[in-house]
């Protein structure tokens, strides 16, 4: 299973970072880093009845597809992509920082946050405490916790650590058992992600969000992830009570990113001019 491979590799990758010196360096950098923007608050403020808030993803590659665009082998202009998202009405950003499987970088996150005035999610496989300090030091406003990747107590501890650092937390689920675990163990969680991608087959099904959304109590922000490619999908999610959607692949691979955002949001070019 691809997730198991990624997690095993991630733990090995992080071993050399487990030093007091590096942690001290990150804590010092945090002191000089502006406080996080409100990721959840922004999603709540920018969603509408007919359109969930858009979390637009800066993504170079994936394990299943490789590079999302051929020209990325020569140049990946992550700053220009993030600025385009901002210009055309995205509510927030998601920035892939995993190096070996998604060809991301923490430096992408840092530079984007220095140039684009939007809240950003550090899209990473969080398996060690040091990663939360990295996320905060590099400018993240929110982090991702993947329930399938964590033990129960680890999920609780990581959530508390992130909140203690001032970060919002998107807790990602894939099925009913994971959702029930989150609602039981993290009763004050605000952001619940539902990933429509099957981690074994990598196929997507929006029915996963529709099924799980009905089980989530009021007061939570529901974020649908993966498999969102057209306006009809967005309408379907809005009708299911989804508050935000995380979209990467269909934006990155579009001939015109701005036009694709307008299509998904159901707005005219004049409305974003």
Over which residues does each language-model region extend?
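A short, conserved beta-to-alpha structural element at the edge of catalytic cores
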Residues: 150-159, 178
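Conserved N-terminal beta1-alpha1 strand-loop-helix module at the mouth
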Residues: 1-109, 114-120, 127-130, 161-190, ...
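Conserved functional loop/turn residues at catalytic and ligand-binding sites
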Residues: 89, 139, 216, 241
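Glycine-rich phosphate-binding active-site loops on the catalytic face of alpha/beta enzymes
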Residues: 134-154, 193-201, 242-261
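Alpha-helical hinge/cap motifs
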Residues: 123-124, 139
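C-terminal active-site rim and adjoining tail of enzyme catalytic domains
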Residues: 226-228, 238, 247
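Acidic, divalent-metal-coordinating active-site segment for phosphoryl/phosphodiester hydrolysis
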Residues: 233
């Amino acid at each position: 299973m691809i997730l198991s491979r990624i997690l095993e590799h991630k733990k090995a990758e992080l071993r050399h970072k487990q030093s007091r010196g590096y942690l001290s360096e990150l804590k010092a950098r945090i002191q000089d880093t502006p406080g996080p923007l409100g990721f959840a608050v922004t999603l709540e403020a920018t969603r509408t009845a007919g359109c969930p808030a858009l979390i637009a993803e800066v993504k170079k590659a994936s394990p299943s597809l490789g590079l999302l665009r051929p020209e990325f082998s020569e140049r990946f202009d992550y700053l220009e992509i993030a600025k385009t998202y901002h210009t055309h009405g995205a509510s927030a950003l998601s920035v892939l920082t995993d190096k070996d499987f998604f060809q991301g970088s923490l430096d992408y996150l840092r530079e984007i946050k220095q140039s684009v005035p939007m809240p950003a999610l550090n899209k990473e496989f969080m398996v060690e405490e040091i990663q939360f300090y990295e996320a905060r030091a590099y400018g993240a406003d929110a982090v991702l916790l993947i329930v399938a990747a964590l033990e129960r107590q680890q999920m609780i501890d990581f959530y508390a650590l992130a909140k203690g650092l001032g970060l919002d937390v998107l807790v990602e689920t894939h099925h009913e058992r994971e959702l029930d675990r989150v609602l039981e163990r993290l009763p004050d969680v605000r952001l619940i992600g539902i990933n429509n991608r099957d981690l074994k087959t990598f196929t997507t099904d929006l029915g996963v969000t529709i099924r799980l959304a009905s089980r989530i109590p009021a007061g939570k922000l529901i974020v649908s992830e993966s498999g969102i490619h057209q306006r009809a999908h967005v309408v379907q999610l809005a009708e299911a009570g989804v508050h935000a959607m995380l979209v990467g692949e269909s934006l990155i691979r579009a001939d015109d990113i701005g036009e694709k955002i307008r299509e998904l949001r159901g707005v005219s070019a004049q409305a974003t001019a």
